[in-house]
From Swiss-Prot:
PTM: The reversible ADP-ribosylation of Arg-102 inactivates the nitrogenase reductase and regulates nitrogenase activity.
Protein keywords: 4Fe-4S, ADP-ribosylation, ATP-binding, Iron, Iron-sulfur, Metal-binding, Nitrogen fixation, Nucleotide-binding, Oxidoreductase
Assembly notes: Homodimer.
SUPFAM superfamilies from the UniProt entry: P-loop containing nucleoside triphosphate hydrolases
UniProt protein name: Nitrogenase iron protein
Keyword flag Metal-binding: yes
Record's function text: The key enzymatic reactions in nitrogen fixation are catalyzed by the nitrogenase complex, which has 2 components: the iron protein and the molybdenum-iron protein.
Length: 296
């Protein structure tokens, strides 16, 4: 019996973590792997493409209705979707009330106590909110739940900045546990020299770009139908991209403690690839009118 592999997907908010996670998990299931997704985001959008639903009812919502999480059964919170994929959404409190990360802690503890991590599973994927690596959202790595961390990024500066910050969070917890950075997944935004840039960033962080996922509108067409590419159009080339990503994760053994870089080094990298121009200190603090007058 192969050891259960627990993987967490982090990345900048809006980078496409949930879409990427669900598409690669669908490809894993298609290949015969037994997988569970645990959504760690109050938006509860981590399982919608697997379940063909708007949003799965969350552990926190069900616990509030029942009185407490102790009043729930595993079948209350766990749904099974495409390819036999098990789906759970942790959820969180109403916006502005309480700690959303608490839902992650509550959900994972409940799943463990109820035996959700059974011996038939090959993979568990935690789809984690944005680029937060503190508090409850760090639960998958802080408590040694997830051993493999994949960071979804793109060639945009803020996505790379978030990836570097997440790497810093991994270092903090890696020193006291087994969590490791397993690679960068580039979810393309069609920026200039994007694949080269992310490979260079991966090198600085001491890891690799495990896969470059090209941008394709077919993904949005599938999402409108609440489906993954593997299910929506299995012969499409984009479905093959997710199969390649899934296969690379299956065979991945490159798990490292990352080497995050300073902001100045990140900016130098962006300038090296022509994404960012060198800063001219002489124009700092000048209005458009002042700059125009100086140029006249």
């Amino acid at each position: 019996m192969a050891k259960l592999r627990q993987c967490a997907i982090y990345g900048k908010g809006g980078i496409g973590k949930s879409t990427t996670t669900q598409n690669l998990v669908a490809a894993l299931a298609e290949s015969g792997k037994k997988v569970m997704i645990v959504g760690c985001d109050p938006k509860a959008d981590s399982t919608r493409l697997i379940l063909h639903s708007k949003a799965q009812t969350t552990v926190m919502h069900l616990a509030a209705e029942a009185g407490s999480v102790e009043d729930l059964e595993l079948e209350d919170v766990l749904s099974v979707g495409f390819g036999g994929i098990k789906c759970v959404e942790s959820g969180g409190p109403e916006p502005g009330v309480g700690c959303a990360g608490r839902g992650v802690i509550t959900a994972i503890n409940f799943l463990e106590e109820e035996g959700a991590y059974d011996e038939d599973l090959d993979f568990v994927f935690y789809d984690v909110l944005g680029d937060v690596v503190c508090g409850g959202f760090a639960m998958p790595i802080r408590e040694n739940k997830a051993q493999e961390i994949y960071i979804v990024c793109s060639g945009e500066m803020m996505a790379m900045y978030a990836a570097n910050n997440i790497a810093k969070g991994i270092v903090k917890y890696a020193n006291s546990g087994g969590v490791r950075l397993a690679g960068l997944i580039c979810n393309s935004r069609n920026t200039d020299r994007e694949d080269e840039l992310i490979m260079a960033l991966a090198g600085r962080l001491g890891t690799t770009m495990i896969h470059f996922v090209p941008r394709d509108n077919a993904v949005q067409h599938a999402e409108i139908r609440r489906m993954t590419m593997v299910e929506y159009d299995p012969k499409h080339k984009q479905a093959d991209e997710y199969r390649q990503l899934a296969n690379k994760i299956v065979n991945n053994t490159n798990f490292v403690i990352p080497t995050p870089i300073e902001m100045e080094e990140l900016e130098e990298l962006l300038m090296e690839f022509g994404i960012m121009e060198a800063e001219d200190e002489s124009i700092v603090g000048q209005t458009a009118a002042e700059l125009a007058a100086a140029a006249a």
